[in-house]
């Protein structure tokens, strides 16, 4: 089974990664409506892959939806967002903190992978999680690098404020990881690292030292076994 995360890249790349086999795909989760996350949503829908996102995200991504198929709205209630059962995957959405209509993160569980945290485009992680085996987490920028670029006139101050209100800094990422029980975690994958405001190598080394875990930097073509056990 396979569960897709986001729909921001050309779907032909996803197809290639799947070896052309869409029969094992049980769905696609989208965190929010920005183009790098939802811009290719029609390509996914046109292959009849079920897409799931918040109502706010679906409305915000309307300009990208040009398909006879429509995404499925994840319902929100007094007790939080509804739990999804997609094949053998259980998905628990949670609210993210980003400059988007109704952004989400996801806790995903499967018998083979254990618990997976997927959190991107959020300046703060409002929840802690139990039973984590693998983590995909944003580590977007270093506040010192960001401030230095503003001081040097490389970027406007308004952009600095936007980044601070929308993305997870290295230090906040580290705090979020420390707030969770990482005992059974096999992999931490750092995602959405800014080219200009981040330092992926330094982030990886710092988080590996602080957590004692295997830490990866997300990049095209990266393959990692997300097993429940270390081997």
Q: Where are the predicted features?
A:
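Active-site environment of divalent metal-dependent phosphoester hydrolases
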Residues: 34-38, 58-61, 100-101, 125-127, ...
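Conserved catalytic scaffold of divalent metal-dependent phosphoesterases
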Residues: 82, 88-98, 108-116, 122-124, ...
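Active-site metal-binding motif and surrounding structural segment of the metallo-beta-lactamase
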Residues: 10-56
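Active-site metal-binding loops of divalent metal-dependent hydrolases
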Residues: 7-9, 33, 56, 96-99, ...
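Conserved beta-strand hairpin/beta-sheet module of binuclear metal-dependent hydrolase folds
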Residues: 1-23, 104-121, 134, 143
């Amino acid at each position: 089974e396979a569960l897709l995360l986001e729909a921001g890249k050309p779907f032909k790349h996803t197809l290639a990664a799947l070896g052309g086999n869409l029969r094992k795909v049980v769905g696609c989760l989208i965190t929010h409506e920005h183009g790098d996350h939802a811009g290719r949503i029609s390509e996914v829908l046109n292959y009849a892959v079920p897409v799931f996102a918040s109502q706010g995200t679906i409305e915000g991504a309307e300009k990208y939806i040009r398909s006879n198929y429509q995404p499925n709205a994840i319902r929100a209630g007094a007790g939080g967002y509804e739990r999804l059962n997609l094949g053998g995957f259980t998905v628990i959405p949670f609210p993210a903190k980003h400059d988007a209509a109704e952004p989400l993160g996801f806790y995903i569980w499967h018998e083979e992978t254990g618990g997976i945290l997927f959190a991107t485009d959020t300046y703060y992680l409002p929840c802690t999680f139990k039973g984590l085996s693998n983590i995909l987490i944003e580590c977007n920028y270093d506040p010192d690098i960001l401030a230095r670029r503003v001081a040097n006139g490389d970027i406007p101050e308004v952009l600095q404020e936007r980044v601070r209100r929308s993305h997870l800094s290295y230090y906040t990422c580290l705090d979020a990881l420390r707030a969770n029980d990482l005992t059974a975690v096999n992999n931490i994958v750092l995602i959405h690292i800014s080219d200009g405001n981040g330092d992926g190598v330094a982030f990886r080394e710092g988080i590996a030292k602080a957590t004692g875990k295997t830490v990866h930097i997300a990049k095209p073509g990266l393959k990692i076994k997300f097993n429940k056990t270390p081997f």
